Structure formats: structure tokens, C-alpha cells
């Protein structure tokens, strides 16, 4: 039986690609002024005590794909067009999962975004990161030519590069340094520079060893993305946002910056 909740069409399950596309069209039609983004993602951010976003992990970045997922996120967050970011509370995240879940009945395609949303939902209930609080976020990039608007947006662009969805210079990173915060990168996650010595002392008082991998605006790529078919002798030599084609080897004295790399 088909039911309608608010302005969103709901059915028990979508068994075919055609049914998923019909649900997508109905959802998009319910969003006044909606325009599908060029790229989008649902992620988990670490927000420091000052309110700065220290990092964001996107388990499933998307480029020109999964429009049903994009419209579900837009419905939950209020996004309609252009480039924007938004936090999601638990109710909003649950609504996204509820909207996407009927598509799981279609076995002719994978559902990586639904799996990612469920994983993120589990993370919401996990102990908070040592360096701040965990925040669920969504990012929409209207055009790859749009410049980054904040750290949440910037991290989606870095993920697009490191997951090989875009090649170097395939998405604007103009002004990205100004959108990111200088961060202490440790084996216990990211920390704000200010107040880190006290945080380190508290960790040691808990009997934990603290390893600082760097103090920079960009983390190591391998802490967020591991591309297939590559070898990296020293993870600290490859910045998040690097693009490493399959077959690439980065030796100990090699280095790869963000928005750079190999094409195969």
C-alpha cells in the first residue's frame, strides 16, 4: 500500500530501478526550487571546543550519482540548490535512513549510501572523540567550479580527490587554506592546538600513550581514504586530497600534496 507522509511519498519497498527512480522524481518534485548537486556526501565531523570543525570523514562521497540519496538529504536538511552544508540531528539522520531503506529491496544495485548512513547512526551513539564532539553533517556542491564555503565542504572536495572521483584540478579548491583549521593530528584523533597540552596530560593520566603525527591543516590521506592498488611507505608523506592512481608507489622520501598526484 502506498502512503504519504508530509510531502514525501512512501511505499513499503522499491523492488526495481524504475521504482527507485519514480520515488526520486516524486521526492524532487516535492522540494520547491530543488536542483540536483554535482557532488554531495553525508559525513561525520569532529567539532573542537572552540566550535571549529577539525575534520570530516565521508564514508561515501558521491559525484553525479545516487540522486535519490541527494534528494533525501536535501529534504532532511532544507537544502535546495547551489553549494551548502548543514548539520543533522538524530531525528534528521533517522529520517534519511527511513526514506532510503525501501530501496534496499532492489537487489540489482548496491546501496552504499544507506550502509554509510546506518554506520554513521551507530557512530552517533559511540563515545565522543577525545578532541571534541561528533557532529553529523551533509555537504552539497552545486557545481565543481564553486569555491569551498567552509571546512565541511572542503573535506568533501578532498575526499572526491583521494577517492579518485575527480582528478587533480577537477574541482575548485580555491581558498581552501582559509576554510581549514590548524590541527594537532594524533593517534587519538584531531585536537585543537590551543589547550592541547592539557588534553595530552589528561590522556597520559588515563594511562594512554600519545603520538603526535603532525600539526597541519591537512591530515594524512590514509587516515580517511585508502585507494586500491597503491603502496605508501610512509603515510605522513601523503596529504589528504592527494590523487593516487592504481599502481602508484610512494617511497619513504616521496611526497604527494593535495590536488596533486598520479593519473595512471
What are these regions (language model features)?
Residues 1-223:
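Terminal amphipathic alpha-helical/low-complexity segments used for targeting or macromolecular assembly
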Residues 225-264:
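Structural signal for interior beta-strand "rungs" in well-ordered beta-sheet cores
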